[in-house]
């Protein structure tokens, strides 16, 4: 499973947790972005596991992209954004899941989901046998978010992006791109389209989402249009990322 945790040890069989997640003085404010709680990332990749086993101390694990920009799914994406800002890139290949980890925390007997991600609500419920509740966004949370990924606009390409629902039939689409779920859209030039999954598989679509943002952004279209995916399983997290990318254009 790929998940970021506020005080939880989670596997497919059982869950144990400690509600005391306030950071100790040994943890620098820079690691928690000034927040009082510690979040623990649980990586799924064997290369990261190997690195952690070699070290005798914990490591901070910020995102490998600039704030508000498209998340990377390959070492090339990281280099594109962070070149000359970091000394090394540990290349473990392209991301298998594509979108970020799920972020969860606890309140009494409930599991709170702060950010939808590659571990689905269904998987968390099955593993923990505990009720799961989404943390709803608010204007205050957007100003001082509890965790990463909670601001209204995020993960966005530089090219203005719109939902397919915003398409006006009178619009000139000759220099516009389209990101679709599983089929070509006749309103757009076929060569201007990126299909996330030819067979309609949500996991494949998730793994391709950010790559589609990078590829289509590089083509310098006037506008990008994207369609919503089925609101189930990992599709919820994909739609969350689409919503935040579109919001940048609206603001």
Predicted regions and their residues:
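Active-site-adjacent structural elements in enzyme catalytic cores
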Residues: 1-251
